[in-house]
Regions:
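Short aromatic-rich membrane-water interface segments that cap or initiate transmembrane helices
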Residues: 23-37, 156-167, 350-359, 434-441
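Hydrophobic transmembrane alpha-helices and their helix-loop junctions in integral membrane proteins
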Residues: 48-87, 96-388, 392-393, 417
Length: 578
């Protein structure tokens, strides 16, 4: 609660905090119009998810809540970072915390494998931020220090190929975190984490930060030219393809996971098309909708022990305390007016100029209504109750369950006002985009009719809607990633290991053996040559000493005789020399 109060205060005051870090690269956080909306959203959704988890998480509570708070803090720092230095620090902590939360049940193999897949997949995209930082530092900019070059606002001013490298790196990092094509499959695996983790991860936290990064760096995309189109088309195609994936799912959490990637596709599209305000409104509204839906799914998973839509048939009708908020969230996800995602999608659609892109976005919007209608139709249908297999540690006390769901349902119902007059104009001014287009009455009416018709059709035909295997398998994206990236990487690693063993290790081992032999030879030479010479000198000195000692008898008459001999010899020598 204190974090939410501080977030609201920061949104009103718009503070800036700065501290020294490394030479030329200070740590700086700032709240502006865009980050204010995101910070308040993260704090509000995080608070409600944690309240829900208070009644639902029984095992290892200190570790769970500590990781959730760390995760939320990293998201808040990501949203307020003004330099690549701070952004990278928060980005890394956010990724590490997500791994720990997805793999929270670390004694089980499946969650650990899921956390590893999510972590490594997003890490592959994270390399793009390092590419962007390298481009910013390498670019020739006169009169600026490293800190100025690494400022997010300065990236749009890079010249030549450095600008395009930075844009490519940012797109790669954002697509990885936002689960856009081709990275989307990691969201499917992330469903093995606890339900509150899924609710926060998919709504206001890590996945949302991918879209937020592109909204923040819209000037960079615009300066690079091609990057705007790449973001727009990448987001639109993800919304379309993952919408088809969501429609084919038989598992509620898998349907919601695919819809997360699809809905973030609209945010990425907004960044590319130049609808920063529309993307922000959609990001905020989607956070309320998706956290609500995941928490409700967690309630039914705990109560019935299943996520299968067939087994959950009629669950929302029987459990009205959960079913009514879920229905509000599902209708909002479908884009049914006047609920939140109806107007926010149209605000984004208003910025799309390409007819082909417009058609793709309309089709993706229709798919949103279809997959939301499918889930709603099955969960509201009459039928036998699911098998009661309650999972210990996942039950949620009634007040701690209903209060967050009710508040999130209220947000899912009203947050679309951010994309409607007069709040739409205020939001555009707050994010510094007063000239962005708005959806007209005709567009709003047409999309409303489309959403209502598609939702009603899907709800009526829910059990008979097509579920192609390629879509149910998430487009086989994980298989493709293993084929195109993982297996070649492992094969390369094995080849390098063999090269290391057969060439490098052999060279090192051979060198060591040669050095040992040389040392052995040197030791033998030392023993046979140097040691013998030293001993010879010592023996000679000892022999000479013995010779010199013989005349030393201690007898005086012998000394006289020796002196007489020496004197005689010296006299003879002198006579001979003359």
């Amino acid at each position: 609660a204190a974090t939410l109060v501080l977030a609201v205060a920061a949104a009103l005051v718009r503070p800036t905090a700065r501290a020294g870090f490394v030479a030329g690269g200070p740590l700086e956080l700032a709240v502006d119009g865009l980050s204010a909306a995101v910070v308040v959203t993260v704090a509000a959704v995080g608070l409600l998810v944690l309240v829900f988890a208070t009644g639902g998480i029984r095992a290892e509570r200190p570790r769970f809540f500590g990781l959730m708070l760390l995760f939320t803090a990293a998201v808040m720092v990501t949203a307020t970072a003004t330099t690549l230095t701070v952004l990278l620090l928060a980005w890394e902590v956010m990724g590490a915390a997500s791994y720990a939360l997805i793999a929270f049940r670390w004694r089980e193999d499946a969650p650990v494998s899921a956390g590893t897949t999510a972590f490594l997949t997003t890490r592959a995209g994270d390399l793009g931020l390092y590419l962007a930082a390298g481009a910013a530092l390498a670019a020739p900019v006169a009169g600026t220090g490293a800190g100025d070059r690494l400022a997010l606002d300065a990236l749009a001013g890079l010249d030549g190929p450095w600008l395009h490298l930075a844009a490519a790196g940012v797109l790669l990092a954002a697509f990885g975190k936002a689960a856009q094509l081709p990275f989307s499959f990691w969201l499917s695996r992330a469903m093995l984490g606890p339900s509150p983790v899924s609710a926060l991860l998919h709504s206001a936290a890590m996945v949302a930060m991918g879209g937020y990064l592109l909204l923040r760096l819209r000037p960079l995309l615009e300066s690079a030219g091609w990057a705007s189109g790449a973001a727009a088309w990448g987001g639109a195609l993800t919304a379309l393809a993952l919408g088809a994936v969501a429609l084919a799912q038989r598992d509620l959490k898998q349907l919601l996971a695919a819809s997360t990637a699809a809905q973030l596709g609209f945010v990425v599209l907004a960044a590319g098309a130049g609808s920063v305000a529309g993307g922000t409104a959609h990001l905020v509204a989607h956070a309320a909708v998706k956290s609500l839906l995941f928490l409700a799914a967690g309630v039914w998973l705990a109560a019935l022990g299943t996520e299968d839509l067939g087994a959950l048939r009629g669950a929302a009708r029987r459990d009205r305390a959960t079913g009514l908020p879920f229905a509000v969230g599902a209708l909002a996800l479908a884009g049914v007016p006047p609920l939140s995602l109806w107007a926010t999608k149209d605000e984004i659609l208003a910025a799309v100029e390409s007819p082909a892109l417009y058609g793709v976005v309309l089709a993706a919007s229709a798919l949103s209504a279809l997959y939301a209608g499918k889930a709603l139709g099955l969960l509201l249908a009459s039928g036998p109750p699911g098998t009661a297999v309650r999972e210990p540690g996942e039950e949620t006390a009634e007040p701690l369950r209903t209060a967050p769901l009710t508040l999130l349902a209220a947000g899912a119902a009203v947050l679309g006002a951010l994309a409607l007059p007069p709040l739409a104009g205020e939001l555009k001014r707050a994010v510094g985009a007063p000239g962005e287009p708005s959806a007209g009455a005709a567009t709003l009416a047409a999309t409303a009719i489309l959403a209502l018709a598609a939702t009603a059709t899907a709800a009526a035909l829910a059990p008979r809607l097509p579920e192609p295997a390629w879509a149910r398998a998430w487009l086989h994206l994980e298989t493709a990633a293993h084929t195109l990236a993982v297996r070649p990487a492992l094969a390369t690693a094995r080849a390098l290991a063999r090269f290391d063993d057969t060439v490098l290790d052999r060279a090192v081992t051979g060198t060591a053996a040669g050095v040992r032999r040389l040392a052995s030879w040197a030791s033998a030479a030392d023993r046979s040559g140097v040691d013998r010479a030293v001993r010879g000198v010592a023996d000679g000195a000892r022999y000479l000493g013995e010779l010199a000692r013989r005349p030393q008898t201690g007898q005086l008459h012998q000394y006289y005789a020796q002196a007489l001999v020496l004197l005689t010899a010296a006299t003879v020598l002198l006579l001979l020399l003359r």
